[in-house]
Amino acid sequence: MSGNDLFPSTIYCIESKIESPRNLYGRFLIEPLAIGQGITVGNTLRRILLGDIEGAAITSVKIPGANNEFSILPGIRESVLEILLNLKEIVFRTKSLDVQKGYLSIQGPCVVKAANLQLPTSIEVVDGGQYIATLSGNANLDMEFVINTGKGYQMADYAIKKNSYISSLPVDAIFMPIHKVNYMVEQDHTSKFLTERVILEIWTNGSISPRDALDIGIKKVIDLFNPLHHCSSEYSTNKNDFSTESKINDILVEELELSVRAYNCLKRAQIHTISDLLAYSQEDLLEIKNFGRRSAEEVIEALEKKLNIYLPKEKY
């Protein structure tokens, strides 16, 4: 008997800390699990957390005077390419899945940081201190940028195809809010029954807490497998269809109650069952020795009326 037969598994948060605004850490204990289940649970959650949790990122930027990423803007220390790389690293927190736009309009001398970005109310910057650029003198930096939500990593060329904003510069987007996931499986010898437990470590970029990420990951696992749970009745129906088809194929041609002439012609052609008969088209029946058009029509009509089977006129 496994531990799961006696009591359900529980998740405990055994450590949680903020290493920096963009680096949150959580360590969790999942127990008890039956022997062999630990690696299944740990590996499944790890893959879901790393690859299936949504995040937000800048995907394209429009900067007046910048025709491409290699442009140089007067009075700005960074090249356009360096600015794009800095924008790529900015972490956003949002619950909206809609495409959103943000703006920046600032005059030097100043140091431009993420806190200077003008954003919709539905989205916020996780770390306002993230560096973007340095402006000297009376230099201006104006931009309009697009924020998308997604999963994983999106190359800049995909942003071009998806958005097609004229004169926009595409940005490689890092949507993944989870930096890293580790897990370890241990056997628990302290309980009455031998069980396993999983120790799961999660690092996030600050847009989501490790605990919330784990909750979302578990829900996604449930949503993934739940539809499969309801497939049993459909499978049962299909299995009955196979059974019905098998029974039809085993029916003897005698069941068609044909005339003696038609019946004898079929028998001489070694057609004994409906399965044998279905290997023929309507044209093939006419080629059977002494099998005239009237006999063929008789067989075709009997198949349709008694078994709801229609012979094709010719072979495909």
Curated annotation (Swiss-Prot):
Major localization class: plastid
Q: Write out the ranges of the annotated region (Alpha N-terminal domain (alpha-NTD)).
A: 1-232
Record carries keyword Transcription = yes
**Pfam families documented for this protein:** RNA_pol_A_bac (PF01000), RNA_pol_A_CTD (PF03118), RNA_pol_L (PF01193)
**Where can this protein be found?**
Plastid, Chloroplast
One MF term in the entry's GO annotations = DNA binding
Query: GO:BP terms for this protein?
Result: DNA-templated transcription
On assembly, the entry states:
In plastids the minimal PEP RNA polymerase catalytic core is composed of four subunits: alpha, beta, beta', and beta''. When a (nuclear-encoded) sigma factor is associated with the core the holoenzyme is formed, which can initiate transcription.
| Coiled coil regions, renumbered to chain | none
Protein name per UniProt: DNA-directed RNA polymerase subunit alpha
Question: InterPro entries, from UniProt?
Answer: DNA-dir_RNA_pol_insert, DNA-dir_RNA_pol_RpoA/D/Rpb3, DNA-dir_RpoA, RBP11-like, RNAP_asu_C, RNApol_insert_sf
Keywords in alphabetical order: Chloroplast, DNA-directed RNA polymerase, Nucleotidyltransferase, Plastid, Transcription, Transferase
Region annotated Alpha C-terminal domain (alpha-CTD) sits at 247-316
Q: What does this protein do?
A: DNA-dependent RNA polymerase catalyzes the transcription of DNA into RNA using the four ribonucleoside triphosphates as substrates.
> Known EC number(s)?
2.7.7.6
